[in-house]
A protein has these predicted regions:
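Charged, flexible cofactor/metal-binding loops and thiol motifs
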Residues: 133-139, 144-145, 159, 165, ...
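Helix N-cap/coil-helix junction residues
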Residues: 66-67, 231, 391, 412
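Charged/polar positions within long, soluble alpha-helices
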Residues: 59, 63, 84-91, 109, ...
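A short structural micro-motif
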Residues: 77-85, 243-246, 402-407
Length: 486
């Protein structure tokens, strides 16, 4: 028999040791690949968390007297060796071993036979829930950091403050300022950060000890493992802990979709304003055409917009997995891993691109004023002026609309009108100074100066606290491991 076939058979035997006791035949190769090949590739992102979870679990087994401290020390030493290898990028997962949990256990058992005791009072069901929650905590923190960076870039961009157009139905609406535009998007991101912070509290509960579905009769200490891993508390119910896999993932993806929708809105504004030549795209974040020499394309902004659509698809993928599954653990939920990992990566990349590109935008102030003049953006203020003079607003609205129609016909702007012309049409006396105040783009835009972007978000402090809590838990776990490793 060729050596590679012998090796594969040996690998299958190793994998089957986890659950092969009641089987007479080895798993079909195609079926095994269908179950594991893609999953194992994705599991690479969970290696560090799986090892860390095992370190805490073994410490707990020793603390509770379930395994001897000497045995625990040997297992922990082996786990540390695997951890070091993984940190150096030298620990690759074998698809034939089904998942990250089996790969880690096999690597530990190859170092010490006591590795076979590592899985006592534990199931891969609560393991994968643990790994996922640990990954999600870090992911939420990293995405939050990326959003805070995007907020900071909006603050930096707002310092270039100038008159800025607003639009409804993609038509010119009213004059505002660049600061006003930046503040609006800053507010959107604040909501994104708030949602992520709220989700973090739900994610930050430890499922370890839930077992396959109904817990375990071993005398485990779930509070201890939760503390070692930096969780606020153990989850309340084992069946819910393993049976709700995919729910938190779908919730995160829903929040990321909303954040990406906000990013898409920013990107689309940039694209449209560049098309109107009101802003100049930075060379560093533009591309050209292979055929047309004059082109300067907003490709990264278009791709951010496109990736928002991807995020929606990933959310629907994850949310769909929750439908029509019975209570307890089901392998359908494995599919949520792809959506989760892709979603986090997509969000971080998109927010980073915008954060770096936005401060480099340049603005053509003359073109912006012309855009507002051509769009008769001060017509609302003109109607308001007439209303302040005693004309009912509905009548003032009609008069202002008629004035705009007349200006369009005569190809002139509101700023070219005289007070006497407007007074004659409106039937009320207004002065030149009052009219100038009402139809001057610069003056009307002043109202938006009241909108200020805070220099620091409260969410930055919350993020810092979460990161510090995880660091403290790492230090505690390291201390407990060292106490058992001689």
């Amino acid at each position: 028999m060729p050596l590679e076939i012998i090796a594969m058979e040996q690998v299958k035997m190793m994998a089957n040791k986890l659950w092969g006791g009641r089987f007479d035949k080895a798993a079909d190769g195609e079926m095994y690949s269908f179950l594991s090949s893609e999953n194992v590739a994705l599991d690479t992102a969970l290696i560090a968390y799986d090892i860390e979870g095992s370190l805490a679990h073994v410490c707990m087994l020793a603390k509770q007297g379930i395994i001897a401290k000497k045995e625990a020390g040997e297992i922990l030493s082996a786990l540390a060796a695997v951890q070091k290898k993984a940190g150096e990028g030298k620990f690759s997962l074998d698809p034939a071993l089904e998942d990250v949990h089996t790969n880690v256990e096999a690597a530990v058992t190859a170092i010490t036979a006591n590795g076979k005791k590592m899985h006592t009072a534990r199931s891969r069901n609560d393991q994968v829930s643990l790994d996922t929650r640990m990954y999600m905590r870090v992911a939420i923190n990293e995405v939050s950091a990326a959003l805070l960076e995007l907020q900071a870039s909006l603050l930096e961009l707002s310092k270039k403050d100038c008159v800025f157009p607003t639009y409804t139905h993609t038509q010119v609406a009213q004059p505002a300022s660049l600061l006003f535009w930046c503040h609006a998007h800053h507010c959107e991101i604040e909501r994104d950060l708030e949602r992520l912070s709220q989700l973090y509290a739900r994610v930050n509960e430890c499922p370890l000890g839930s077992g396959a579905v109904a817990g375990t009769t071993w005398n485990i200490d779930r509070n201890y493992t939760a503390k070692l891993l930096g969780f606020s508390a153990p989850t309340a119910n084992p069946m819910d802990s393993v049976g709700s896999r995919g729910e938190l993932e779908a919730e995160l993806l829903s929040h990321l979709y909303l954040a990406m929708a906000h990013a898409s809105k920013i990107a689309t504004d940039v694209i449209l304003l560049a098309n109107k030549r009101l802003i100049v795209l930075p060379d560093e974040y533009s591309t050209g055409s292979s055929m047309m020499p004059q082109k300067k394309n907003p490709d990264p902004f278009e791709l951010v917009r496109g990736k928002a659509s991807r995020m929606l698809g990933l959310y629907v993928h994850a949310a769909g997995l929750l439908k029509s599954v019975p209570s307890g653990y089901n392998l359908d939920s494995q599919e949520s891993k792809y959506a989760l990992l892709q979603g986090v990566k997509t969000a971080e990349q998109s927010f980073s691109i915008l954060a770096h590109a936005l401060p480099l935008l340049k603005f053509d102030k003359e073109e912006i004023v012309l855009e507002l003049e051509k769009g008769y953006a001060c017509a609302t203020e003109l109607a308001d002026l007439l209303a302040k003079k005693g004309v009912p607003f509905r009548s003032a609205h009609s008069v202002a609309g008629g004035i705009v129609k007349e200006c369009i016909a005569k190809k002139k702007f509101l700023s070219a009108l005289s007070a006497s012309e407007v007074s004659a049409v409106a039937g009320v006396k207004i002065t030149d100074a009052e009219l100038k105040e009402a139809v001057s783009v610069d003056k009307v835009a002043r109202f938006s100066a009241a909108y200020k972007i805070p220099a620091a978000s409260a969410h930055a402090k919350a993020l810092e606290a979460r990161v510090k809590a995880l660091d403290a838990a790492h230090a505690l776990l390291e201390k407990e491991v060292k106490a058992l490793v001689k």
